[in-house]
């Protein structure tokens, strides 16, 4: 019996030592990695508007850091899939520290997009940091950062000026939801949306379409809201009434 007790004690001691050793190794390996979030590359706008018939649109990219970055850019459609409707040049380039470059966006749609309303795409710019050669032997985790902004293709001669679109928005209560109705040919990014004293979620309302947000049962009928204009700025606060 005594031999069995000693054997059990030895096993428990061995298990404890193994557990402590594994914990120590995990701590060391975690400490050996440094997550470097690269925030040095900034875009010159929060959205891109591409007017139909224009040869190109431009987007400034600035490297505020001292390090070099590899910049990769592409366009996605509204569903998030890569799309060849627009060509970006240069699509891939090295950007030195404290420098600025310009991305040129060229129309390759051949007039195939709707001409009575805007079409939404997404502009993606990935900044991949260069690796310091002196740290190649270290366990350093380099993180690439993707900046993703809205990219609107805007047909020519739309019936309504873009700065008049926000005031055309309509609102309808549908059970526990508020439906935002956009009769204009423009996408409307609605923010600071309130029903009475209740604060509601932001919404992106497609042209000639609708979007819905949750509506508390005690929400008031008076609606106040703002939208974001072509320059990324907030429009004046507007009022609406729930139908």
Where are these regions (language model features)?
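Short acidic, flexible loop segments centered on an aromatic residue
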Residues: 64-81, 183-198
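Intrinsically disordered, low-complexity Pro/Gly/Ser/Thr-rich segments with frequent PxxP/GP/PP motifs
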Residues: 83-111, 197-222
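Buried hydrophobic-core signal for structured, non-transmembrane domains
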Residues: 57-63, 105, 121-126, 177-181
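Bacterial N-terminal signal peptides
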Residues: 23-32
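Terminal connector regions
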Residues: 110-158, 221-243
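Beta-sheet-dominated interaction scaffolds and their linkers
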Residues: 38-60, 161-170
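Bacterial N-terminal signal peptides that target proteins for export
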Residues: 6-24
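Intrinsically disordered, low-complexity segments enriched in serine, threonine, and glycine
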Residues: 171-243
